């Protein structure tokens, strides 16, 4: 295995997923009225409802 592959393998195996997420609400995409999409599952369910 080459040095670059060894480095990648080590960094992959040593990665930590503990702690706070890096995503911040101030960077979230917002609609023109300032709201954000906080309940996407509800929206998707409503879009898939069959109208009779």
From Swiss-Prot:
The keyword Calcium does not apply. Keywords: Sporulation. The keyword Methyltransferase does not apply. InterPro entries: SASP_SspK. It comes from the Bacteria. Induction: Expressed only in the forespore compartment of sporulating cells. GO terms for cellular component: endospore-forming forespore. One of its GO terms (biological process) is asexual sporulation. Residues 1-52 are annotated as: Disordered. It is found in: Spore core. NCBIfam families: PRK03081.1 (NF002843), SASP_sspK (TIGR03091). Belongs to the SspK family. This is Small, acid-soluble spore protein K. It comes from Bacillus cereus (strain ATCC 14579 / DSM 31 / CCUG 7414 / JCM 2152 / NBRC 15305 / NCIMB 9373 / NCTC 2599 / NRRL B-3711). The gene is sspK.
């Amino acid at each position: 295995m080459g040095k670059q592959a060894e480095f990648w393998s080590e960094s992959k195996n040593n990665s930590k997923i503990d702690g706070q997420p890096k995503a911040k609400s101030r960077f979230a995409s917002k609609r023109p009225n300032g709201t954000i999409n906080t309940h996407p599952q509800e929206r998707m369910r409503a879009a898939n409802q069959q109208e009779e």
